[in-house]
Structures are given as C-alpha cells and as structure tokens.
Regions:
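Charge-rich, low-complexity N-terminal segments
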Residues: 2-147
Length: 147
C-alpha cells in the first residue's frame, strides 16, 4: 500500500510548508476503507501538488502533508471536516526549504509497517514540546520502504 504517484512540482522553497497532525478514527478502518481513503487522498493531493505520508495504528492517524502554503491549508481544512475521524490536533507546522516526500502524493504505513513504540514515542515527545516536533523520528518510520 505504500504506492505513490510522482507529482510535477513547481515550487519556490520559501513558499513550502509542512504540517503534521494526529487524529482518531471514529470507527476502526479495515483494509478496503484504508485503500479507498488512500485513493482519494492521492487524487486530491495530486491536484493540489501536496505530498506527504500517512500512518495508521490502533485507530489513530498521523499524517505529514507538505506543499505550497495555501494548498496545504486547503488540504488540511478538507481533512478536519472529514467525519471519519475526530480530535484532529496539529503536532507541528513549519516552513521548509525542501519536501521530505517529493515523489509521494501520499505514502502510507499501518502498524504492520511501523514500530508501534516509535509512533507512541513520537506522540509523547510532541505532546511535551510545543516548540519542536521530532520530524526525523517520523521520517525514520518510512526508511525501510520496500513496497
């Protein structure tokens, strides 16, 4: 499921932002529902030139989206209004000089593809530190992308 779609990017580095959020699914997502969600995300993100990665574990989503400021904000507004999840909390947002996932319209991992303890540690660290989110830890979850 870690399929991605290359996106043509015409970006000025000073206009790029990255936003990472955590949310809770209203109901657990089965494989078919996750695949449908990813298909929709990849289509919408391709239209907006938004790239990123999504983790799903134990009924929780953690997603990093990146792109032009306005496109990321439109995408995030769409995410917040989605009734399939609740308690959407921004963990980190910042201007970036380059994308972390330039070729992924939406990378994906479930708890089978990521260490659950790592996900929990990231969330705990982010909760304690409002100033800085450990983005490198999040990115390491995708370092063994063999899909």
């Amino acid at each position: 499921m870690a399929e991605s779609k290359n996106i043509a990017i015409d970006a000025s580095p000073d206009k790029l932002i990255s936003k990472t959020y955590l949310s809770r699914a209203v109901e657990p997502f089965e494989t078919a529902a996750l695949e449908a969600l990813l298909t929709s995300c990849r289509h919408n993100n391709g239209q907006e030139q938004v790239t990123g990665a999504l983790l799903y574990h134990g009924g929780y989503f953690m997603q990093l989206i990146e792109g032009f400021d306005e496109a990321v904000e439109r995408t995030y507004a769409r995410i917040v209004s989605d009734s399939r999840h609740e308690i959407v909390s921004v963990l980190f947002e910042d201007h970036i000089s380059a994308r972390f996932f330039p070729d992924w319209s939406m990378g994906f991992r479930t708890s089978e593809g990521a260490d659950a303890a790592s996900i929990e540690a990231i969330y705990e660290t982010a909760s304690r530190s409002a100033a800085r989110f450990p983005i490198n830890d999040f990115l390491l979850l995708f370092s063994n992308d063999g899909d």
